[in-house]
Design a protein with these regions (language model features):
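Nucleotide-activated chemistry modules centered on ATP-dependent adenylation/adenylyltransferase
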Residues: 1-51, 87-111, 117-480
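A phosphate-binding catalytic loop at a beta-strand-loop-alpha-helix junction
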Residues: 46-80, 285
Length: 480
């Protein structure tokens, strides 16, 4: 790059910074100064900042967009006072919940912040097979991600847990995320620091949780148990393999490096900078990078909203199936309780919960919500309400002990065939093609997975013997 071009790009980036700072409130400007100082101290001063690499994980939500805007402002602020600044690695972890729409939002944010073509920014798309530079001109990056394996894990977990939302939707996602994070760290140059926007105690709780589960699963104590966050991530990767082995699913080829566990990444916690006293929902900075939006307009693809609404949806469907209630009764009860539990909490997720409770407070609005959530689950996992209802009844585990009750309640016309269906679950040669197709249709699972469930037991959350039960038993957030 010529000296003239460098000067021109420096001018452009300072114009970007000037425009971005115009959206910062006074408290946000103070928070930005604190963030800059924190990064400089972690790097060892201005003289070392040019060789310092900071990584942030982007999961598609507004918290991530807000954090990214601050980091970009910090990066450009340092560039304005010294010839060099830190390298910012933005890792987009490609999981099914990062939909085409979410990816398009990330692209909008990157355009507004001028991160494309900036040599001090590494924008990565990370999936199970590869890590690649994210380019706005590569359309494949924004195609829908296939999720057959993901759907199978979620539905099997749903059957084993009788549809407990956190055990059904969250644990498989958590375990698989560890490998994506490690791939993002191992790509290219060494990562010096990870940005963490959650409360300071969060990573400690995460590390302790994963280590407790690993011990429960029989992993012998070694160096990984005595160190910090990076070691916990490596244990989490092992648990992801355990989870797939347990469900008798194929374990992807391990493409990760074999670096030693003592290469801990520095954690730069920015919770007090970005989350403590700032009302993110009304921030002009967020409006700028995200575009105009309104939380009252349903945005189920917002991660914090999706977690709440999926749990509410499961409670609504469970009430219909097992108690004879109308759908809106269970949903409204869940949202009302969640809003009350978060009444005095002003963190972003709590703000979202309270706004959701206020927005979906009539049967008509909740029925519209149901259609949106059903569409969302179908887009993410190819999961229908029929599949979810089947998981809630869990009719195939414990050698199909609940099959008769399930058929009597949901498919009385199929009661005559229960013995044939049971045989289809027991052995391949005894199954008719029609029975197999029907079982796969109502469950969303291949018959091979249904036969695995046939030989498994429902999760006893108090005993902690299975992997799901161990995750639940030690989960610090299972009641949140």
């Amino acid at each position: 790059m010529s000296n003239f071009h460098e000067q021109a790009m420096h001018f452009v980036y300072q114009q970007v910074l000037h425009r971005l700072l115009g959206f910062f409130s006074r408290p946000e400007r103070i928070a930005l100064q604190l963030l800059v100082q924190r990064i400089l101290v972690a790097a060892g001063g201005l003289e070392r900042i040019g060789s310092y690499r900071v990584m942030v994980v982007h999961e598609g939500g507004k918290e991530c967009a807000y954090t990214l805007a601050f980091l970009r402002a910090a990066q450009l602020s340092i560039a304005g006072r010294t010839p060099e600044t830190f390298t910012l690695r933005i890792a987009v972890l490609r999981q099914p919940r990062v939909t085409t729409k979410v990816m398009a939002r990330i692209q909008t944010q990157c355009n507004e912040l001028f991160v494309y073509d900036d040599p001090t920014v590494e924008l990565l798309l990370v999936d199970e097979t590869q890590v690649r530079r994210l380019d706005k001109h590569i359309p494949v990056a924004f195609e829908r991600l296939g999720s057959d394996m993901d759907r199978t894990q979620i539905l099997m977990a749903g059957h084993l847990s009788e549809g407990v939302p956190r055990a059904t939707f969250f644990y498989a996602d958590l375990l698989s995320r560890a490998k994506l994070y490690r791939r993002a760290c191992e790509w290219g140059g060494h990562v010096d620091a990870l940005i963490d926007r959650r409360p300071p105690e969060h990573l400690g709780e995460y590390s302790q949780w994963i280590k407790q589960v690993a011990l429960k699963q029989g992993h012998a104590p070694n160096a990984l148990f005595t160190q910090g966050f990076e070691s916990a991530v490596k244990l989490c990767s092992k648990l992801d393999d355990d989870f797939k082995h347990w469900l008798r699913l194929p374990v992807p080829l391990n493409l990760l490096g074999t670096t030693s566990a003592d290469t801990e990444i520095n954690i730069i916690n920015v919770f007090d900078c970005l989350s403590y006293e700032v009302d993110m929902l009304h921030s002009q900075v967020l409006m700028f990078v995200e575009g105009s939006w309104n939380i009252k307009i349903l945005d189920i693809e917002e991660p914090q909203a999706a977690v709440v609404l999926l749990s509410a949806h499961v409670q609504g469907v469970r009430g219909v199936c097992q108690c004879g209630d109308e759908y809106h009764v269970g949903v409204q009860e869940f949202l009302r309780k969640a809003s009350a539990d978060n009444q005095t909490n002003e963190r972003y997720k709590s703000q979202v919960i309270k706004q959701l409770g206020g927005s979906f407070n009539t049967p008509r609005r909740i029925e519209k919500l149901r259609h949106s959530i059903t569409h969302y689950l179908d887009e993410l996992h190819g999961m229908t309400d029929e599949h979810l209802v089947c998981a809630l009844y869990s009719p195939f585990v414990d050698q199909a002990s609940g099959l008769e009750a399930f058929l009597r309640q949901r498919y009385p016309a199929k009661l005559y065939a229960q013995n044939d269906l049971r045989l289809a679950l027991m052995e391949e040669n005894a199954a008719s093609e029609a029975d197999v197709k029907w079982l796969e249709s109502i469950s969303g699972l291949p018959v091979s997975s249904l036969r695995v469930l046939f030989g498994m037991s429902k999760t006893d959350f108090t005993a902690g013997k299975s992997l799901i039960a161990a995750l639940w038993m030690h989960d610090p957030n299972k009641l949140l």
